[in-house]
């Protein structure tokens, strides 16, 4: 087995906390594409749905650029979940006080490789 070419996809400012998406990303790192999608579809998390969209986008980028490529030849190489923008707002509380509310977002970067078999 040798690795021929890499294809990437990015999801920016996705509405989920990076802390919630990272454990899901760890489950699919290094897995074949079909297995990674099966894992993500079986998870009930919002982050799994967002991650699935980015993984599918990376795979479709790979199949668009290489017409001879099938889903069986693709595997997930790199999955990075970084902090995105934080939306801060005020949450009114009792007796005239206010708390700060921080809505977090994340950036997801997925890199897939094509797996080819050949003689050595």
Swiss-Prot record:
A Pfam family that the UniProt record links to this protein: Ribosomal_L22
Annotated stretches, region: Disordered: 1-25
Annotated S-S bridges: none
Record GO cellular component, one term: cytosolic large ribosomal subunit
Swiss-Prot/TrEMBL GO biological process terms: translation
Keyword Ribonucleoprotein: yes
Keyword hit for RNA-binding: yes
Assigned keywords, A-Z: Ribonucleoprotein, Ribosomal protein, RNA-binding, rRNA-binding
GO MF, one annotated term: rRNA binding
Highest taxon in the source lineage: Bacteria
Family to which this protein belongs: Belongs to the universal ribosomal protein uL22 family.
Job of this protein: This protein binds specifically to 23S rRNA; its binding is stimulated by other ribosomal proteins, e.g. L4, L17, and L20. It is important during the early stages of 50S assembly. It makes multiple contacts with different domains of the 23S rRNA in the assembled 50S subunit and ribosome.
Complexes and interactors: Part of the 50S ribosomal subunit.
Full protein name: Large ribosomal subunit protein uL22
Gene that specifies this protein: rplV
């Amino acid at each position: 087995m040798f690795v021929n070419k890499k294809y990437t996809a990015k999801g920016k400012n996705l509405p989920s906390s990076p802390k919630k998406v990272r454990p899901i990303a760890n489950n699919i790192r290094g897995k074949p594409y079909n297995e990674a999608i099966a894992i993500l579809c079986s998870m009930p998390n919002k982050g799994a749905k967002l991650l699935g969209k980015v993984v599918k986008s990376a795979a479709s980028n790979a199949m668009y650029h290489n017409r001879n490529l099938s889903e069986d030849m693709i595997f997930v190489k790199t999955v990075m979940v970084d902090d995105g923008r934080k939306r801060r707002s005020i949450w009114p509380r009792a007796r005239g006080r206010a708390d700060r509310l921080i809505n977090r977002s994340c950036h997801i970067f997925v890199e897939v490789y094509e797996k080819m078999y050949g003689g050595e």
